[in-house]
Amino acid sequence: MKTLVLLSALALLAFQVQADPIQNRDEESKIDEQPGKEDQAVSVSFGDPEGSSLQEECEDLICYCRTRGCKRRERLNGTCRKGHLMYMLWCC
C-alpha cells in the first residue's frame, strides 16, 4: 500500500513538472498576442562620448524587440529581454 502511494505521488510530481513549462508557454503566447507591445523602439548607444565612425553610421538605426521575423529591410542584430522573456532585436 505504501508503495502504491509513493508511486502515485511520483507520477503526480512528474505530471506537474511537465505541466509547468506548458503554462509558461501559454503565458508567453498571451503576452505575444497583445497588440501594440510587439513593436517597441529600443535606444542604441555607444561607449565613446566623442563619437566614432560606427556611431555615425548607426545614428539613424531603429531597433525593435519582437518574437516574430523581420519586417521590411530589417535584420537580426541580437537579443533583448523584457522581464524574464527573451526576444529578438531587429534593426533597420
UniProtKB/Swiss-Prot annotation:
Propeptide: 20-57
First and last residue of the signal peptide: 1-19
Keyword annotations: Antibiotic, Antimicrobial, Defensin, Disulfide bond, Secreted, Signal
Protein's UniProt keywords contain Signal: yes
GO terms for biological process, alphabetical: defense response to bacterium
Cystine bridges: C63-C92, C65-C80, C70-C91
UniProt-annotated stretches for the region Disordered: 24-53
Protein location: Secreted
Residue stretches of biased makeup (Basic and acidic residues): 24-40
Family under the similarity heading: Belongs to the alpha-defensin family.
Role, per record: May have microbicidal activities.
Protein name per Swiss-Prot or TrEMBL: Alpha-defensin 25
